[in-house]
Regions:
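N-terminal domain-onset segments
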Residues: 8, 12-101, 105
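Alpha-helical structural elements
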Residues: 24-25, 32, 64, 117-120, ...
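Core of folded catalytic or high-affinity ligand/protein-binding domains
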Residues: 75-148
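Basic, alpha-helical nucleic-acid-binding regions used in initiation and control of genome expression
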Residues: 131-136, 140-189
Length: 189
């Protein structure tokens, strides 16, 4: 029995070191993002939809029109998080971390451009715009936008956690949201 418990403890500790977001956490995260956007009315909804469905070669959608809505979106997102626990904020930070990591790719950077920080902030913008746009960029990096940025989204839940609970959340993911940290996204040339 003690051998089994020791083995279980090691497996659990290892699993905690490389914790990935659950499907439930991801669904809750995207629902929260959508709720924050929905509260702002039809104009940003139409802009977001147009961004996610546009022809990246055409000039018929101004991708920067959404920038005026980012601060109200972030304020509303903050309001929606007021009653979240430490664990919930950590879970959401883990989701953001994973989403940023998954699009930390050279093919996305080729479209967005930017320094390491600039590319991180652009990926934050992609996440902030919502799931439909995020998935469009994942599938076709040409959908990304040159020099867009939302620095606040990159550490949004981590900052809330720090403000409310006095420390930075430990996501236990074993990955980094920083630029050029996803080796699968940056093949050696």
């Amino acid at each position: 029995v003690s051998v089994r418990l020791a083995t279980l403890r090691r497996v659990t500790e290892t699993a905690d070191l490389t914790r990935v977001p659950t499907a439930k956490d991801e669904a809750r995260f995207w629902a929260l993002v959508e709720a924050a956007w929905a509260s702002l009315g039809p104009e940003p909804a139409a802009l977001r939809r147009a961004l996610a469905t546009r022809d990246p070669e055409a000039d018929d959608v101004d991708p920067y029109a959404l920038d005026a809505w980012l601060d109200p979106f972030l304020a509303r997102l903050r309001d929606l998080c007021v009653d979240l626990s430490s664990r919930e904020l950590t879970d959401f930070d883990r989701v953001v971390e994973r989403k940023l990591y998954d699009i930390d790719r050279q093919d996305v950077h080729n479209v967005t451009d930017g320094s390491d920080d600039g590319f991180l902030y652009c990926r934050g913008w992609i996440v902030a715009v919502g799931r439909e746009f995020y998935e469009a960029v994942r599938a076709d990096p040409a959908m990304a936008v040159l020099d867009a940025g939302c620095e606040q989204m990159c550490y949004f839940f981590a900052h809330l956690h720090s403000e409310r609970f006095g420390d930075w959340p430990d996501t236990g993911s074993g990955i980094s949201r920083e630029s050029v940290s996803n080796p699968a996204g940056w093949p050696e040339e």
